[in-house]
Amino acid sequence: MADYQGKNVVIIGLGLTGLSCVDFFLARGVTPRVMDTRMTPPGLDKLPEAVERHTGSLNDEWLMAADLIVASPGIALAHPSLSAAADAGIEIVGDIELFCREAQAPIVAITGSNGKSTVTTLVGEMAKAAGVNVGVGGNIGLPALMLLDDECELYVLELSSFQLETTSSLQAVAATILNVTEDHMDRYPFGLQQYRAAKLRIYENAKVCVVNADDALTMPIRGADERCVSFGVNMGDYHLNHQQGETWLRVKGEKVLNVKEMKLSGQHNYTNALAALALADAAGLPRASSLKALTTFTGLPHRFEVVLEHNGVRWINDSKATNVGSTEAALNGLHVDGTLHLLLGGDGKSADFSPLARYLNGDNVRLYCFGRDGAQLAALRPEVAEQTETMEQAMRLLAPRVQPGDMVLLSPACASLDQFKNFEQRGNEFARLAKELG
């Protein structure tokens, strides 16, 4: 455990994670200073009076006088103020690094462009099914520092690339990169390999590395080694097995679960289940309770969630598809009896949309494109695309056209922040309109 006594600590970024950092230091007899570029950041009213605060901008004077800077994942390490501090030899960490220095129980660590919240939650459910006292959080749910507890027997953390950039003490019992597709390219000017390099930090000092056999970018930089266990659709130690019209989860040649016993559906969710099972096995959880958890887990909101099934039409909320890879995962292997009415749009974060084109060639596809990058998305297949300013306009346009057997799918391939507070608000709005229009 690290000793912070007498250190001049500056925390950048408030919100729930920033407050958890403040509480962490106060409990150790250190009163940090806090700054946030927002004038009235969330959590400002909960900050103890003794804590100095600076809002509306960064305070370079405070930063250059610090012994330790705890940076929010929301601020790029390339920011001039942080670059200057790093050049001056000032240590810059994030909340996950603070957590890793303190945690006494094993850690399962999960990252990836898509599926990480589902897999994190699933591994947590597997641990609970085994009667293990588990703490689940990080990039979802509770900030990691709020999970610290002497009685905790296992931690399961979802980690973003931004969080991994400031983490060096992670020693996971099992770690995975589920997949690597273009995302956050606005934060990674050197492209996909720079983004991948941040993700790969999760494998440093990991006991077992769970890699995706179908995605070479998830492999450690020197290639697979004796620490690696793999999962995949047809390849890998953990893979899918198709026999006589049925699909099984299979581990090293042994069929362990028929997917019809699972509440989750879709090929991408079956591979998520394989990854979760590989992590749970590596963490020493009993296989039987892990499989039981797979039969009861219903999935997370806004992730290929059926919000309405009415008059033979399925309305599916996949608002969490905030990048191209996630929408690809939703469309890959998707079967629709009638027409697929696909809602795309928002802020594409400088991504290349062209990989989507191959999924949009069918005669039964109609595109409804909205938001900041709607025109770019409509250009993927203009003859079947219509462009509107908002998602609501798009839904009101398509609603009179749907027939029994059709599917209305919101899988936007973009962030929501151009028109919504977050992907949850976008998904809730879709669900509300589906119930009104369907």
UniProtKB/Swiss-Prot annotation:
E.C. code:
6.3.2.9
Has the keyword Nucleotide-binding been applied to this entry? yes
Q: Which UniProt key words apply to this protein?
A: ATP-binding, Cell cycle, Cell division, Cell shape, Cell wall biogenesis/degradation, Cytoplasm, Ligase, Nucleotide-binding, Peptidoglycan synthesis
Localization terms from the record: Cytoplasm
**Catalyzed reaction equations:** UDP-N-acetyl-alpha-D-muramoyl-L-alanine + D-glutamate + ATP = UDP-N-acetyl-alpha-D-muramoyl-L-alanyl-D-glutamate + ADP + phosphate + H(+)
Binding locations of ATP: 112-118
Entry keyword annotation includes Kinase: no
Q: What are the protein's GO molecular function terms?
A: ATP binding; identical protein binding; UDP-N-acetylmuramoylalanine-D-glutamate ligase activity
Q: Which InterPro entries match?
A: Mur-like_cat_sf (IPR036565), Mur_ligase_C (IPR004101), Mur_ligase_C_dom_sf (IPR036615), Mur_ligase_cen (IPR013221), MurD (IPR005762)
For biological process, the GO terms are: cell division; cell wall organization; peptidoglycan biosynthetic process; regulation of cell shape
Reported cofactor(s)? Mg(2+)
Quick one: which pathway?
A: Cell wall biogenesis; peptidoglycan biosynthesis
Q: Name one Pfam family in it.
A: Mur_ligase_C
The family this protein is said to belong to:
Belongs to the MurCDEF family.
What does the function comment of this entry state?
Cell wall formation. Catalyzes the addition of glutamate to the nucleotide precursor UDP-N-acetylmuramoyl-L-alanine (UMA).
UniProt name for this protein? UDP-N-acetylmuramoylalanine--D-glutamate ligase
- What is the organism field in this record? Escherichia coli (strain K12)
